[in-house]
Amino acid sequence: MRVKINLECSECGSNNYLTSKNKSSHPEKIKVPKYCPKERKVTLHVET
């Protein structure tokens, strides 16, 4: 089952990305390095 998730910047707290994941095969939270336009650099984004 795929669910929609938000990715939140770990430094500034803004929700920058919307994605989906398969919850049955990946039950853990996603942590992905992505570009944050507010910080203007690549930061770690975590699932909210």
Swiss-Prot record:
Family, similarity comment: Belongs to the bacterial ribosomal protein bL33 family.
Name of one Pfam family that matches: Ribosomal_L33
GO biological process, one term: translation
InterPro entries: Ribosomal_bL33, Ribosomal_bL33_sf, Ribosomal_zn-bd
One Gene Ontology cellular component annotation held by this UniProt entry: ribonucleoprotein complex
This protein's encoding gene: rpmG1
GO molecular-function terms, A-Z: structural constituent of ribosome
Coiled coil: none
Keywords from the named record: Ribonucleoprotein, Ribosomal protein
Source organism: Streptococcus pyogenes serotype M1
PANTHER family per record: 50S RIBOSOMAL PROTEIN L33, CHLOROPLASTIC (PTHR43168), LARGE RIBOSOMAL SUBUNIT PROTEIN BL33A (PTHR43168:SF6)
Keyword Ribosomal protein: yes
Protein name as annotated: Large ribosomal subunit protein bL33A
